[in-house]
């Protein structure tokens, strides 16, 4: 068997160490091994002469001499080599990997590299961030999560279009009424997360791995390529290393070569920034899919269960364990400014545990911007309302008073037995028992009503059989400070303050406003993504500062009595130049006799192996 060429000047006659690839097929890598192309006898790699035969060899981990076999011409008959069992240890099922498999594997690798390159592109990442910023701006301009009627009324079609094109139908079609939970918003965040991950994997992390290597330079010309280079006559590399250690450098010395660096955290900073941004994106997505929200208007003195008002934003949202607790509204109060407008409103709330018989677990008075947080649920003070008005009727002869007395007498007679008389019970009724608690309803948004207004009605007679409205007193209030009375004809009668004790005569009745019961408007929210978002923003601030740290490197090479020193940095280059000047000025200059000793020792020292650059 005659070889066509030799590799490294040696040849082998081991046909089992060779995989023959059919002529004309592209050169591929099998199982990560390297291939070498050998040419026919007399040919050189630079020759332009077209070769008829191409031999491809598989090299092992050691440099043995290899036989070069002539590749057979492709034929229609199956090759005996293809059917022969493999002895190469590749573990490919007893045969050589087919060219089709190699091409498919290479195509996947090429596609993966192209995908990573596209995702890690800085212009594309900026474009995705700009898209998210535009969508967020639209979400700020267009009110979110309102009713369909709201958008149809406030963004009408026709000549009154907002901005000339924005209509309610367009907003609903493009999901602009809930941008932050729209499909395209989540898709944009997913693309940004993929771009950050690809950039970290393909660019930032390899840069950190390179920065961690000890890179010794053994030739003066290698130092010249690193940037600024200085030559110190009569100097020792050990003295330079000691000074660098004092300056906070990590120093490594080997056979007259020195490598020192500091500020490696600056290389890790961009990775931390990307990780913090990914954490923010994850928290945002988790909030979108896992949030539970709800609103409740609870009157003073009443309670409600948290789980009854929490609505999940998606099927994967889970109810927190604290949702089974009960909230009791102890007191609701409002502070007013001197002009009578509302300054602040407060709700005194108690958290009760039904599993422990309604035991009070927590209690807090909340207000606007001071929420109530408990076990993953946050309760905000967002609104208020008027729930009821309590009136007292003066005089035992008033019809309403007599009706109330009769009802009390009937209840007392049914509980005290047959010997009790209604008259005696009626005589014992105190005057303050003839009181009425009338519920109030909001008239806000009704025709002819401006602002917030609550109303109730005190009937004085049964409704007529003809369907006519019953005779009664209309009672209105805009806030808990004052109550307005109108008679049966709709004529204004007067205004009274709750708790003043001053009666007002309406339709022959003397009425006293005892109290106006308020209702607190609370927004309930359980957002599991908030901790991740806060942690991401905190990490983003810290890692952004870290990324501004300079990564500085210094190389030195002892050549006789001369010391070659080079250095570079990625930031604050002027400051690094000044620092390097101070370091070089601090290196002591040796006397001639000591310099001669250093030169002789350097000349007898073994040459240092060249490190991988």
Curated annotation (Swiss-Prot):
Lumenal side: 143-178, 290-613
Domain of life: Eukaryota
Pfam families, alphabetized: ResB (PF05140)
Membrane-crossing residue ranges in chain numbering: 122-142, 179-199, 269-289
Cellular localization per UniProt: Plastid, Chloroplast thylakoid membrane
Topology, Stromal side: 93-121, 200-268
One GO BP: cytochrome complex assembly
Main location: plastid
SS bond list: none
InterPro entries membership: Cyt_c_bgen_Ccs1/CcsB/ResB, ResB-like_domain
Composition bias type Low complexity, residue spans: 409-428
GO CC annotations on file: chloroplast thylakoid membrane
Keywords: Chloroplast, Cytochrome c-type biogenesis, Membrane, Plastid, Thylakoid, Transit peptide, Transmembrane, Transmembrane helix
UniProt record similarity statement: Belongs to the Ccs1/CcsB family.
Known partners and oligomeric status: May interact with ccsA.
Biological role stated in the UniProt entry: Required during biogenesis of c-type cytochromes (cytochrome c6 and cytochrome f) at the step of heme attachment.
Protein name according to UniProt: Cytochrome c biogenesis protein CCS1, chloroplastic
Organism the protein comes from: Chlamydomonas reinhardtii
